[in-house]
């Protein structure tokens, strides 16, 4: 895999932005074998620009204001070319360049000949545009720096890129690139395969952008929130593409095996986040959150524990790998993000539970007196019980029968006393992980709180 940084735009190219790209790629496990920076390949770019110029397919533009492309003329009309510069004789052009006058180098787009520029796109099919409608775009700016068009094409030619895949908003640029490819390589050589992908848009239909939707478009936002990289890749692949069957949750290898350019949709893909988000979860598309939860559930316990343990320790809790291995299967079905471990399993990590409402101890169709009887009997029973799933099951169900209660009425006060909440993992497994000493201590504290 080749990684090429298109860094010729000096204003936008910062160390922070480059490091962010590298961090995101590494998190996604997209390693690379070779690394190129366009800014270090300027000699190649200028060599190809000069070759095009020597073929008579480019000209110097000495107009001071012309440092790039996309200029406008009056009444909102798109600028196409400057006749005075386009028709400047080679001798006059050489004289002015030799005198040190700065110039931009522009491609000499064929005009008045009825020519068409065409290419076949793997997603959007046959694309045709009249050459007369394409401006004489810049190859080199007046400061000598190559434009995006020239640098990208020059590097694609040199590195022998076979497929050029980018956003649909680059379709208009591709006509210019076809002209560059043919001018640099010769008309008889095959073009790369072009494929333009549908755009990712916000719920309001606007294109996603760093300026407006910063966190949503940053890969590191998903990483820091606790997404698994395979889940994020799964989500990205399903934006504008779907397999031929009805699968949604797919591994990396399954995605590789099923993917084809022909399966990409032409319609823009909507990323359904809330704007503005009122909770961290609303920053993300619900489908992405669901996929992440599914990928978490599919992880082997040891792998999940290895991901959760650094998060727990970073939060200041001293937890052993052995204990984390015991906790992970209990919360695997209950978390959507890796960082949810800090709220789903916090009662496993603390010595003292935070305050909770004693009313939570009261079982369904019961009262405070019933809750107190349950906890008192549980303290007696658990003191002599074997702290295994089967041992706790047998002891507590027998105690419920003695008290004339349903199992749920027996279990709820114990669960709240042990975990500080009604919504917690399965009771017996939870008590085993907490251990006899901690369980009895918390039940004792709950009893004192009710008196």
Q: Model-flagged regions — what are they?
A:
Residues 325-390, 394:
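Aromatic-anchored, charged helix-turn/loop surface patch used as a conserved interaction hotspot
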